[in-house]
């Protein structure tokens, strides 16, 4: 049995603070402070703090990562590309988790999962470099059987399944097909002994079905929480998301009762 398997009732929320930094950088100010947002999110029930240090530093910057690392009380999940610069930073900072993601400068946000099959040697080397530095590695991948198998073969103990196509589905039938791909991917990851997380594009009205899947350990959500906070406040936005996730998981385990 994998060390990472948890009880079916447990589901964690990783709050992504990237778009707090986006708001700050829109006017070149020192506020809102993403580090302050991270600490407040922890107080409101977040189980981890996720942040993506992109090569172009469009939102999170190096100082955010360095300032947050000694102050985080839960876990820091640093998303980064498979490049020498980013791997060196991750090995220096030593977050609790490093999630390797694909990255293109032209994209508004991450558009798909990391192609582990096509870049296997580079990804495997990155996993070893991070593991040697004491950092747990996660791979952000599409819910594809070949990618999941390749992720396992790299030695990474965690995968995060890309839920963007589910979130962006144009109709209910397409969304159901994407949900079934995710559910199958969760089962495949669990069967290989991997910890399975998920995220991308999830919000307050589409997260329920994903949170109900008992094999998922953690959901990473950011933009929706930042947007909802405009209306209800940051603390409430975090608490509401966590409550929705937990309620969906409990209802699924008890047959909707």
Curated annotation (Swiss-Prot):
Q: Which GO terms describe its biological process?
A: pyridoxine biosynthetic process
Keywords recorded for this protein, A-Z: Cytoplasm, Pyridoxine biosynthesis, Transferase
**Any idea of its EC number?**
2.6.99.2
According to UniProt, the reaction catalysed is: 3-amino-2-oxopropyl phosphate + 1-deoxy-D-xylulose 5-phosphate = pyridoxine 5'-phosphate + phosphate + 2 H2O + H(+)
Q: Which residues bind 1-deoxy-D-xylulose 5-phosphate?
A: 18-19, 54, 59, 109
**Active-site positions, per UniProt?**
52, 79, 200
Q: Site annotation (Transition state stabilizer): which residues?
A: 160
Q: Does the keyword Nucleotide-binding apply?
A: no
Any one GO MF term held by the record is: pyridoxine 5'-phosphate synthase activity
Name the InterPro entries on file.
Answer: Aldolase_TIM (IPR013785), PyrdxlP_synth_PdxJ (IPR004569), Pyridoxine-5'_phos_synth (IPR036130)
Binding-site positions, 3-amino-2-oxopropyl phosphate: 16, 27, 201, 222-223
- On whether Cytoplasm is a keyword of this UniProt record, the answer is yes
Example of a GO cellular component annotation carried by this entry: cytosol
Localization annotation? Cytoplasm
Stored Gene3D superfamilies: Aldolase class I
Q: Top EC class per UniProt? A: transferase
Q: In which pathway does it act?
A: Cofactor biosynthesis; pyridoxine 5'-phosphate biosynthesis; pyridoxine 5'-phosphate from D-erythrose 4-phosphate: step 5/5
Tell me, what does this protein do in biology?
A: Catalyzes the complicated ring closure reaction between the two acyclic compounds 1-deoxy-D-xylulose-5-phosphate (DXP) and 3-amino-2-oxopropyl phosphate (1-amino-acetone-3-phosphate or AAP) to form pyridoxine 5'-phosphate (PNP) and inorganic phosphate.
| Family designation | Belongs to the PNP synthase family.
| Subunit (UniProt) | Homooctamer; tetramer of dimers.
Q: Could you tell me what this protein is called?
A: Pyridoxine 5'-phosphate synthase
Species of the source: Burkholderia mallei (strain ATCC 23344)
